[in-house]
């Protein structure tokens, strides 16, 4: 719907996006008057866990000085509330400036009590321009849910650290160092994770070099790639396991076995599309599981 009252132009767009676990309703409203545009985006889902919220901003457009003036936009982000997985978060006031092919982000701040995401820096095609993202106790599950990466793999854990990005509009260079407390894969807790990650432009994936510290004095080591972009979404990881909790395997064996308990030590290759992951290697285990067809527990 687009309207043109006497003193401004207004537009409204509403749509519904169907997902595997429910629908997401979106509405976008904008009003333009003179050199300003006010925009409000509302969204909400109808799944068991609530994801909803509002993003509101006012953009002012200016012309730069010089013989060939360019359009400059100053966007003021207004304070609003967002619900992530039934938890209330706050978007704080900040400013984004778009000028001559550059985007300056000035203290974008998103928080829930002492958990937060803070973004500062410049986006451009210049390698010298960098954006810094600070994270404190951000649940990795939120990222996978919002990005809708896959319903067949679930990463959890509270991530703290810093990520950097440069040359974003040309050939992105992105890297991060994170500490993830109580890292888990498909409801199987693996331990505390220290990880270095970097975006690989050629492979269109994230290179990982990580260590997982749990009960063993020696950490488990994970090196490889995660491919978050569809349709190639999947992973290719080499794992040097030291008494690694095997609970995460229950998700992939649920058609034949359940109640998997125990730990494994050895070298394995964990790879494939998220919908059909494979696990190869040699592992010494001290574990048990229940085979449904026999209704019996076995030790392995």
Where are these predicted regions, by residue range?
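Interface amphipathic segments
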Residues: 1-300
């Amino acid at each position: 719907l687009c309207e043109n009252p006497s003193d401004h132009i207004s537009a409204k767009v509403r749509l519904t996006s169907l997902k595997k676990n429910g629908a997401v309703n979106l509405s976008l409203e904008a009003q333009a008057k003179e050199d300003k545009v006010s925009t409000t985006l509302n969204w909400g889902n109808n799944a068991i866990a609530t994801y909803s919220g509002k993003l509101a901003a006012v953009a002012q457009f200016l012309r730069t000085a010089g013989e060939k003036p360019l359009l400059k936009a100053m966007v003021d982000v207004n304070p609003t509330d967002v619900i992530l997985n039934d938890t209330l978060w706050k978007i704080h006031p900040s400013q984004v400036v778009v000028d001559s092919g550059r985007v300056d982000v000035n203290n974008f701040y998103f928080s829930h009590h002492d958990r937060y995401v803070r973004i500062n820096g410049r986006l451009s095609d210049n390698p010298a321009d960098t954006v810094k993202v600070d994270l404190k106790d951000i649940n990795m599950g939120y990222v996978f849910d919002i990005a809708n990466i896959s319903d067949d793999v679930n990463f959890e854990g509270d991530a703290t650290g810093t990520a950097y990005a440069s040359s974003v509009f040309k050939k992105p260079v992105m890297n991060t160092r994170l500490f993830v407390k109580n890292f888990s894969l498909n409801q199987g807790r693996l331990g505390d994770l220290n990880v270095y990650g970097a975006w690989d432009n050629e492979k269109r994936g994230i290179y990982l070099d990580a260590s997982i510290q749990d009960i063993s004095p020696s950490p488990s080591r994970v090196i490889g790639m995660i491919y978050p972009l569809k349709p190639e979404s999947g992973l290719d990881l080499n794992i040097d396991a030291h008494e690694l909790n095997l609970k995460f395997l229950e998700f992939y064996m649920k058609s034949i076995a359940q109640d998997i308990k125990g730990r494994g030590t050895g070298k394995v290759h964990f790879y494939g599309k998220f919908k059909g992951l494979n696990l190869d290697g040699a592992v010494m285990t001290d574990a048990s599981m229940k085979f449904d067809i026999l209704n019996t527990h076995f030790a392995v």
